[in-house]
C-alpha cells in the first residue's frame, strides 16, 4: 500500500490571498497527476455537513439497515457457493437522488420531509461549489471562464446533477466482496462527502492502491471521463474502489456534476495542438457514452473511447463515399 502523506489536500482559503498562485499550481498538479484531491474551507458550513451526516446515518439505521442485512446474508451465502458471482457484487446500500435537470427527491420513498429539505439545501451548495471548481480548472487550463460549465450544459441548457447516498456496513468477508469494485467515473466532476471515521476509498496511482484519507468536513473531488476528453488528456479520470471493512459503517455522499444528456463532448480546441496527427479523444453525445458505460463500468475506459473513435471514422468514411 502506498503512503497517503502525499495525497493532495488543498485549502481553498488560500485562493483569496497572496498564496493563490501556489494553491492554483497545487490544484493543477492534483488534476494532472492524481485525478483526485481533497479540499478544505470550501464554503459549505460545517453545521450543514454535520446535519447531513446525522440525518443520513439515522435514515440508514431506520429504513435501510434491515433490508441490507437480509440482502447481505443471501449475498454471502451465494458468494461462498460461487466465487465468480461474488466478484461481481458490491457491499453497499445506496439510493440515488436526481437534482438537475429536474429533481426527483419528492419521489424517493421513505425519506422524511426534513431530510428532503436538507438534501435540497446541500445539493444547492454542492452545485455552486462544482461550478466554482470548474472555473478554477478553466483558469489553469487557459480556457475562458465558464467554458466547462457551458460545455456541460449542452443544447438544453442544463447539466445532469445527482447524488448517490451510500452506506458500506461492516463486512464479515472482505476477502470475498468489494465495497465497490474498481472503476472510473463516467461523468464530469464528482464531489464526495465521506465518513471521517471509517475509511476504505482507494485510488490507483502508479500501479499501487492509495488510501484517500478521511478528513472531517472536507470534500473529496475526483475527475470523470468527460473532463479527460474535454482537456484532451491533460487531466485524467482515475480508477478507484471502496474496500469492504470488517468494522464500522462508512457513509458516502457522492454528488456527480455531469454534462446534460444532449451535450456534445469533445476536446476543447484550445487544448488540441496543431501538430497532433492522431486524434486522441473522440466526439460524442454524453447520453450515448452513458449507454456504453453502464454495460462496461467495471472495465477499462480506453476501449470506450476507442469505440466512439471508430464510430467517428465510420461516419466520416460514409460521408466521403457519398
From Swiss-Prot:
Gene Ontology biological process terms, A to Z: ethylene biosynthetic process; fruit ripening
Using the record's annotation, list all stretches that form the Fe2OG dioxygenase domain: 159-259
Name its co-factor(s). Answer: Fe cation
Catalytic reaction equation(s) = 1-aminocyclopropane-1-carboxylate + L-ascorbate + O2 = ethene + L-dehydroascorbate + hydrogen cyanide + CO2 + 2 H2O
Could you tell me which Gene3D superfamilies the record lists for this protein?
A: B-lactam Antibiotic, Isopenicillin N Synthase, Chain
- Supply the EC number(s): 1.14.17.4
Q: Which GO MF term does the entry hold, naming one?
A: 1-aminocyclopropane-1-carboxylate oxidase activity
* SUPFAM superfamilies linked: Clavaminate synthase-like
Q: Does the keyword Chaperone apply?
A: no
Q: In which pathway does it act?
A: Alkene biosynthesis; ethylene biosynthesis via S-adenosyl-L-methionine; ethylene from S-adenosyl-L-methionine: step 2/2
Note whether Metal-binding occurs among the keywords: yes
Q: List positions binding Fe cation.
A: 183, 185, 240
Q: Which keywords does this Swiss-Prot/TrEMBL entry list?
A: Ethylene biosynthesis, Fruit ripening, Iron, Metal-binding, Oxidoreductase, Vitamin C
Q: InterPro entries in the record, alphabetically?
A: DIOX_N (IPR026992), IPNS-like_FE2OG_OXY (IPR044861), IPNS-like_sf (IPR027443), Oxoglu/Fe-dep_dioxygenase_dom (IPR005123), Plant_2OG-oxidoreductases (IPR050295)
What EC class does the entry list?
A: oxidoreductase
Alphabetical list of PANTHER family matching this protein: OXOGLUTARATE/IRON-DEPENDENT DIOXYGENASE
* Family per record: Belongs to the iron/ascorbate-dependent oxidoreductase family.
Q: Under what name is this protein listed?
A: 1-aminocyclopropane-1-carboxylate oxidase 1
The record lists the organism as Oryza sativa subsp. japonica
